[in-house]
Swiss-Prot record:
This is DNA-directed RNA polymerase subunit beta'. It comes from Saccharophagus degradans (strain 2-40 / ATCC 43961 / DSM 17024). Belongs to the RNA polymerase beta' chain family. DNA-dependent RNA polymerase catalyzes the transcription of DNA into RNA using the four ribonucleoside triphosphates as substrates. It catalyses: RNA(n) + a ribonucleoside 5'-triphosphate = RNA(n+1) + diphosphate.
Length: 1410
């Protein structure tokens, strides 16, 4: 019997599915979903509140209003289940079928679906090859369209106005057919022969020349192919039957007072039904054509409004003047179905309350109020009460719990034991915003939170609230404990640094106890061990900060994991010994034997985690906290006004600055300096004064002189509370102290520019009215910024999560040896990020080889941990190629090797880790700390004057990077290349400094030369751009005629004559074609050739250049022929902060981007046009370019400053004209790696300025997603269309297949999409639709019959399955395996016959009847 029932069950549809397909519904399909037709616009009877028959809420069509009860009341109860009442026609079943039973409306005339008409690009328009305007004219009954031309001169699809139609009727009679309205459009679409049309277009494309035409044709071809492949029929874009939403999804609720609250959809449906019925009646009456036509148009409009109100014409409004919410509005936007109900749901078994500190808790605990716990764990308590026999039924158990009997509390204790709960604080900006804790029952009503996890939650105790959630199933509890427990989340996933780090009071306490105090009680005592020290301290024989000697037992952990301990005598203080008591074995004493500022504490915790392990670290962190609180209490440290000591020298400094400013004002008044220069100088003076005041204030506050044991003066760090707060990193910073005790300094206006009157007072002295006003002026902007910032930052995070949500680690190793080459980030003389920091936790892509030999230092595939970093730093390696997400070859997701270390755990990433979301959160979470403002270069910002030399900071060896030089006779080198760099390496061979060297700079050192720190090794004139000779010879001038192409000037003081070349625009017409040039010849007058090339030494002189040689002068190598004055490049605002990050990720083109050379070759200038210069690049040796031309031309606006001049050679991708970089150009000309480096460095610059650490690999994951599309440039033998956008991986796979078959692969170009575009271009339509532009995405997906394979996380959340990441990845893999096994076994088993099913049915019915 059971087998038979199982057999029946197995025949039904299964819940297992692996994809969702969206398509167009045919009219028959709509009717097949329907349970009946809605014929009347009535909803419910206002007296009886019963639904009207055949109305919008009809019980006969949609099902009963009450469970198992028909409308007239004849059948009630379960036993009549399935019977249809003969009186009212209602099926007796559950009332919830009213949530899924649909109905339909038979439309009297077909109606075009507005989505396919108006959602751009219009699908109907594309298919019929008509403009949207003309289709609308037909649909809304303004024109006729010819549907069948017959044997006439008319064409199919031609529009006719009324007059033209009547004329044609007279001329041709019934030969042709023309219609209007949706019927006409439907007819035209029925007549399309998809296959033939597609074939015709395929033949047309190769014979078409114009780009736009090809684009148009390929768009149409794609659409036609989509229809052919998906099995959708074009005529289904016109509705014949309109589906009606189940009534419980558009409810009508009676309010008190006899009014009803209703969903807007009911209004919209009523309109459609009314018009439809009226149209039916008019058609039955054979009404005049014009009336019928009008009614049809109104029907079309009312269906449009139902589907997407406001898409065409004015939106239909309700009684409250608001537009009605149509079906399209129900699914889109933050309040729509996707974001409100599918991606974000409310959760049962949860509660929220205010949080307070729990300084006595352990790290894995939280205090849960008893009242809350009782409510949250109710079901567990009920089952326990029943199990123990304390309550007979659930109802009795419920009563016991409500009465709060004593036994209930005992049971609650048991239930809660080791049952973790999740705590969440909104906004949840990264994954550490939800962590698991073990609850500890407490009295009161507030949740207690462990202070160390506040940093992760970004929580404080000023009234923040948190939510508690209970994981119910055993698996959920297990995951909460193993993965989400606060003790397992010590490191931040963004940077890999500890995030469980003491702050504020705790830091202060630890700092205070580890400070030294000169001549404290018991100084100089010697102790044998820790115990003796603590006995002496607690019996008050020795002060906490006394300097003493102690014999300690120190354990050092070896790399191999062995540890060895040793005894030694150390100089230390009592407080440090007390701290040493709680430090785990394996940490060297040196890490503790210093004042413990916040950074030092963080370093200890980090070291402890890496060397000693997780468990010890957690215990240690807790002990640190308890001890810190204890001693910060004991320190009694507090501040009063007198702690802010104002330096005596302040008044004098301000007076001096004032005097300087007055002097400049006087110069300005007499016209010696310009307005801008005065402003900059004044601001410079005040910034300097402010720094000096701050310096003397910090000196006064941070040191104090005391008498020591010997009675001599000794200087020690001050015990001033304010200084201690700032020095320890507990609270405040020198900048804040400066405002309290120094001077407030310069203030900014809301637009970011600096006010030149500074505030000379500080907060201790108090501000006067003017000063107060100046402060508020810029401060208000700050507050407004903060509000905007939060929203913008949230939106950035949302876009990032959306673009990266489907990146999961899917395999161990993809086997590529590609990667990014990593070098230290050096700006000028500072190493901003060392190579070690950049490659830590990455996998080496290719063997690292010792310079100048073939010894392998680091084999490929090595994961670089802290030990390796030390080794690599000591070997003097400068560059390592590491595996990267960008170059990973995995088809879906990324492999573990390319990703490297899981930052939050410190070991190689596991398969299933959702790295995309982690990357998005790591970049988005600090977003609120970034600024919103654009910095104006002005005042304090522009103090760096134009550099004119390179001064090295430390000694080292000089290295030249792609600098072309010529040597003068004196031995100096002159740079004759643009993008050259000069670097300084230390003794180990690591680069420590790096400087850009401009063209024409004089370099006084050679490659490999040793230089001392402070020596100047290169200099140049920042205001002119020289033209340098590369060979020696005699000068021959050409094309120089005074007054036509040049102007002579004689300096009155020196009597020297200089020649200025006139700009072509300033020359008289006779001189336009003259090309002033200098040619170098040898003694015999033969032209000299440049070294290593066949080109003559011929230097063109550009306009505005100044030149002082005469015919026949001799010049040496490296001499300057002419100088071109540089106008100061315009000061640009630098966009900083959040807008800059958004610009980079959206891959926006800057306003005036730098222009790069498209090919390598020689530069020359062609004929100028009005306002533009023509730059011509000729490839060397007469090579021919891909498009068959012999050179490359580009027009550049005249106002752009060019960095190249005539006759110079440039390399592909070199900058020709300055400006902000355009990432698309970098990708096209320099490749993926250069682009990755550019975006990573630019984004890191923004975050570094705010002191935020983010690992490079997060940015790389996002960049990988931005690069996932390519544009097809050549079709080859593939099925792709030229100009279409395809997934990179898809093209690679297709090309591999084609190569294997020996056919022509497709050619393509990588494309860079901004994150919004990339999210919308994802393969999954569910993910794209739930992100933005829902209507457009769904329209496109349904026309092309897209299948969503549910690969990403978002799609799976929407359809309510486990996500394919973490434990879900294994679950899905297992499911797939099972299904494949079943498919294999099923093929062998025999099929079920109809007879067997019938037998089983009768059997089953008998058993249920008995």
């Amino acid at each position: 019997m059971k087998d038979l029932l199982n057999l029946l069950k197995n025949q039904g549809p299964s819940d297992e599915f692996d994809g969702i397909r969206i398509g167009l519904a045919s009219p028959d399909m709509i009717r097949s979903w329907s349970y009946g037709e809605v014929k009347k616009p009535e909803t419910i009877n206002y007296r009886t509140f019963k639904p009207e028959r055949e109305g919008l809420f009809c019980a006969k069509v949609f099902g009963p209003v009450k469970d198992y009860e028909c409308l007239c009341g004849k059948y009630k109860r379960m036993k009549h289940r399935g019977i249809i009442c003969e009186k009212c026609g209602v099926e007796v079943t559950l009332a919830k079928v009213r949530r899924d039973r649909m109905a339909h409306i038979e439309l009297a005339s077909p109606v075009a679906h507005i989505w396919f008409l108006k959602s751009l690009p219009s699908r109907i328009g594309l298919l019929l090859d008509m403009t949207l305007r003309s289709i609308e004219r037909v649909l809304y009954f303004e024109s006729y369209v010819v549907t069948d031309p017959g044997m006439t001169t008319l064409e199919k699809g031609q529009l006719l106005t009324d007059e033209q139609y009547f004329e044609a009727m007279e001329e041709f009679g019934d030969e042709f057919e023309a219609k209007m309205g949706a019927e006409a459009i439907q007819q035209l679409m029925k007549d399309i022969e998809l296959e033939r049309e597609a074939q015709e277009i395929r033949e047309q494309i190769p014979n078409t020349n114009s780009e736009t035409k090809i684009k148009k044709l390929s768009k149409r071809l794609k659409l036609l192919e989509a229809f052919i492949q998906s099995g959708n029929k074009p005529e289904w874009m016109v509705l014949e039957a309109l589906p009606v939403l189940p009534p419980d999804l558009r409810p009508l609720v009676p309010l008190d007072g006899g009014r009803f609250a209703t969903s807007d959809l009911n209004d919209l449906y009523r309109r459609v039904i009314n018009r439809n019925n009226r149209l039916k009646r008019l058609l039955d009456l054979n009404a005049p054509d014009i009336i019928v036509r009008n009614e049809k148009r109104m029907l079309q409009e009312s269906v449009d409004a139902l589907l997407d109100n406001g898409r065409r014409g004015r939106a239909i409004t309700g009684s409250n003047k608001r537009p009605l919410k149509s079906l399209a509005d129900m699914i889109k936007g933050k309040q729509g179905r996707f974001r409100q109900n599918l991606l974000g749901k409310r959760v049962d078994y949860s509660g929220r309350s205010v949080i307070v500190t729990g300084p006595t808790l352990r790290l894995h605990q939280c205090g849960l109020p008893k009242k809350m716990a009782l409510e949250l764990f109710k079901p567990f308590i009920f089952s326990k009460l029943e199990l123990r026999g304390l309550a007979t039924t659930i109802k009795a158990a419920k009563k016991m719990v409500e009465r709060e009997e004593p036994v209930v509390w005992d049971i609650l204790d048991e239930v809660i034991r080791e049952h973790p709960v999740l705590l969440n604080r909104a906004p949840t900006l990264h994954r550490l915003g939800i962590q698991a804790f073990e609850p500890v029952l407490i009295e009161g009503k507030a949740i207690q939170l462990h202070p160390l996890v506040c940093a992760a939650y970004n929580a404080d105790f000023d009234g923040d609230q948190m939510a508690v959630h209970v994981p119910l199933t055993l698996e959920a509890q297990l995951e909460a404990r193993a993965l989400m427990m606060s003790t397992n989340n010590i490191l931040s996933p963004a940077s890999g640094e500890p995030i469980i780090v003491p702050s504020q009071d705790v830091v202060l306490g630890l700092y205070w106890m580890t400070r030294e105090r000169v001549n404290d009680k018991g100084e100089g005592m010697i102790f044998s061990d820790i115990k003796e020290v603590s006995r002496a301290f607690y019996s008050k024989q020795v002060g906490l900060q006394a300097r003493i000697k102690v014999r300690i037992d120190e354990t050092i952990m070896e790399e191999s994991g062995e540890s060895e301990s040793s005894y030694r005598m150390v100089d230390t203080t009592v407080g440090r010994m007390l701290l040493w008591e709680i430090v785990p074995k394996g940490i060297p004493f040196e890490m503790i034997n210093k004042p413990m500022v916040k950074k030092a504490i963080s370093a200890v915790i980090n070291f402890c985690y890496r060397i000693v392990g997780l468990k010890a670290t957690v215990i240690f962190a807790d002990q640190l906290m308890y001890m810190g609180y204890d001693f910060s209490t004991k320190s009694g440290s507090s501040i009063g006004v007198n702690d802010f000591e104002i330096p005596e020298a302040k008044a004098g400094m301000i007076e001096r600055a004032d005097a300087e400013v007055k002097e400049i004002e006087a110069q300005y008044a007499s016209g010696l300096v310009a307005q801008g220069e005065k402003y900059n100088k004044v601001i410079d003076i005040w910034s300097r004064a402010n720094d000096l005041v701050a310096k003397s204030m910090m000196e006064g506050i941070s040191k104090e002189t005391v008498k020591n044991k010997q009675g001599e003066d000794e200087e020690q760090a001050s015990f001033n509370s304010v200084f201690m707060y700032a020095d320890s990193g507990a609270r405040g910073s020198p900048a804040q102290i400066r405002q309290l005790a120094g001077m407030r300094g310069l203030m900014a206006r809301p637009d970011g520019s600096i006010i030149e009157t500074p505030i000379t007072a500080n907060f201790r002295e108090g501000l006067n009215v003017l000063q107060y006003f100046i402060s508020t002026h810029g401060a208000r902007k700050g507050l407004a910024d903060t509000a905007l910032k939060t929203a913008n930052s949230g939106y950035l995070t949302r876009r990032l999560v959306d673009v990266a949500q489907d990146v999961v680690i899917t395999e161990q190793d993809c086997g590529t040896d590609e990667g990014l080459s990593m070098t230290p980030v050096i700006e000028g003389g500072d190493v901003i990020e060392s190579l070690g920091d950049r490659i830590l936790g990455r996998v080496v892509a290719r063997d690292v080889i010792r310079p100048n030999s073939d010894e392998i230092l680091v084999p490929a595939g090595t994961m670089i941990d802290e030990k390796w970093v030390e080794r690599i730093e000591s070997m003097g390696i400068d560059e390592v190629t590491v595996r990267s997400a960008i170059s990973c070859d995995a088809v879906f997701g990324i492999c573990a090797q390319c990703y490297g270390r899981d930052l939050a755990r410190g070991h190689r990433a596991n398969v299933g880790e959702a790295i995309g979301v982690i990357a998005a959160q790591s970049i988005g979470e600090p977003g609120t700390q970034l600024t919103m403002r654009t910095f104006h270069i002005g005042g304090a910002a522009s103090r760096a004057s134009a550099a004119d030399s390179v001064e090295v900071k430390q000694e080292g060896t000089v290295r030249l990077h792609n600098i072309k030089v010529v040597a003068r006779e004196s031995g100096e080198l002159i740079a004759v290349s643009r993008s050259g760099e000069l670097a300084l390496a230390d003794a180990a061979g690591r680069e420590r400094e790096r400087y850009k060297i401009p063209y024409g700079a004089v370099i006084t050192v050679k490659e490999g030369e040793q230089v001392k720190g402070g020596s100047i090794i290169a200099k140049w004139d920042p205001h002119t751009h020289p033209i340098v000779t590369e060979v020696a010879g005699r000068v021959v001038l050409a094309g120089m005629e005074d007054g036509l192409s040049i102007r002579k000037q004689t300096d009155e003081l020196t009597g020297l004559t200089t020649i200025e070349i006139l700009d072509p625009s300033e020359r008289p017409s006779a001189g336009k074609d003259l090309k002033p040039a200098v040619t170098l010849v040898d003694e015999n007058g033969n032209e000299l050739k440049l070294a290593n090339s066949e080109q003559p030494a011929h230097y063109m002189l550009p306009g505005k250049s100044i030149f002082s040689l005469k015919n026949g002068d001799t010049v040496g190598v490296g001499d300057i022929i002419a100088r071109i004055p540089q106008e100061g490049s315009k000061t640009r605002d630098i966009t900083g902060g959040l807008p800059r990050v958004a610009d980079l990720f959206e891959a926006r083109k800057p306003k005036e981007p730098s222009i790069l050379a498209e090919i390598s070759g020689t530069v020359s200038f062609g004929k100028e046009t009005k306002g533009k210069r023509r730059l011509v690049i000729t490839p060397p040796n007469g090579a021919v370019l891909e498009d068959g031309s012999t050179h490359y031309e580009v027009l550049i606006p005249k106002h752009r400053h060019l960095t190249v001049f005539e006759g110079e050679t440039v390399a592909k991708g070199e900058v020709v004209s300055d400006g902000p970089s355009n990432p698309h150009d970098i990708l096209r000309l320099k490749g993926v790696e250069a682009l990755a480096n550019y975006i990573t460095n630019e984004i890191q610059d923004v975050y570094r300025l705010q002191g935020v650490k983010i690992n490079d690999k997060h940015v790389e994951v996002i960049v990988r997603q931005m690069l996932r599309k390519v544009e097809i440039t050549g079709m080859g033998d593939s099925s792709f269309v030229k100009g279409e956008q395809v997934e990179y991986i898809a093209v690679l796979q297709e090309n591999e297949k084609l190569r294997a078959e020996g056919r022509q692969p497709a050619r393509f170009e990588r494309q860079l999409l901004g994150i919004t575009k990339a999210s919308l271009a994802t393969e999954s339509f569910i993910s794209a639709a739930s992100f933005q532009e829902t209507t457009r995405v769904l329209t496109e997906a349904s026309v092309t019959g897209k299948i969503d394979n549910l690969r990403g996380l978002k799609e799976n959340v929407v359809v309510g399955r486990l996500i394919p990441a973490g434990t879900g990845l294994a679950y899905h893999a297992e499911r797939r395996r099972k299904r494949e096994d079943q498919a294999g076994s099923k093929a062998g088993s025999d099929t079920v016959s109809a007879a067997e099913i019938e037998a089983a049915l009768t059997e089953a019915l008998k058993s249920s009847a008995s």
